[in-house]
């Protein structure tokens, strides 16, 4: 366990397509990581799941894979969780941002991006930093009453096309800031 607290002991699950072993550990807040060993499984997902066939064809949206998952933690907790990912998961800190790099006139945050080494799995960990007002991290921690996953980012080769296709399926998005916001970005 390398110091991690167990959420789920290794459990063997089987069906006619083979077997998987699932286990899990606790991380920050109520966040858990579930591990699935599928090397002896040929089914569509996990035992008990069946492939679903639609009676209509849909156009692909362009979503490709999960790019990263961001975790928000409390004041002075980021380095503790960086060490956790290093010690428990063997991850490396391959990118860091301090409050001088991620800030506005009123708020700031700090972030360290943890990765499995080849960049396929990325977990940025954010913590609040001092500012004139509460940072988005503090607002998150207050609203959700503690640490947790802020967002999961999905990769696409064409964001305009993907958003258009997702909107046509009823997915709602936040409004984009006005052009003045983007013009001011280089000066921040």
Regions found by a protein language model. Give the residues of each.
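Vicinal oxygen chelate
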Residues: 2-73, 77, 83, 95-132, ...
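Long hydrophobic segments that form regular secondary structure
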Residues: 85-91, 146
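Short glycine-enriched loop/turn motifs at secondary-structure junctions
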Residues: 64-65, 145-149
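Extended non-catalytic domains of envelope/secretory-pathway proteins
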Residues: 82, 143-144
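A short, acidic/glycine-rich surface segment
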Residues: 133-138
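C-terminal, well-structured subdomains that either form a transmembrane helix-short loop-helix hairpin
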Residues: 148-159
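Short helix-capping and inter-helix turn/linker motifs at the boundaries of alpha-helical repeat units
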Residues: 59-60, 139-143
């Amino acid at each position: 366990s390398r110091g991690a607290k167990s959420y789920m002991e290794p459990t063997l699950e089987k069906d006619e397509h083979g077997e998987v072993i699932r286990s899990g550990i606790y991380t920050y807040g109520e966040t858990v990581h579930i591990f699935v060993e599928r090397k002896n499984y040929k089914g569509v997902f996990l035992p008990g799941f069946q492939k679903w066939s639609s009676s209509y064809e849909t156009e692909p949206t362009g979503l490709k894979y999960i790019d990263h998952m961001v975790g928000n933690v409390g004041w002075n907790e980021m380095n503790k969780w960086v060490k956790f990912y290093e010690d428990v998961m063997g991850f490396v800190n391959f990118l860091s941002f301090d409050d001088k790099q991620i800030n506005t006139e009123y708020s700031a945050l700090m972030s360290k991006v943890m990765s499995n080494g080849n960049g396929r799995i990325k977990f940025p960990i954010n913590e609040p930093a001092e500012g004139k007002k509460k940072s988005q991290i503090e607002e998150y921690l207050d609203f959700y009453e503690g640490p947790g996953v802020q967002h999961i980012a999905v990769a696409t080769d064409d964001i305009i096309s993907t958003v258009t296709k997702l909107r046509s399926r009823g997915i709602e998005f936040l409004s984009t800031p006005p052009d003045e916001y983007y013009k001011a970005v280089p000066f921040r």
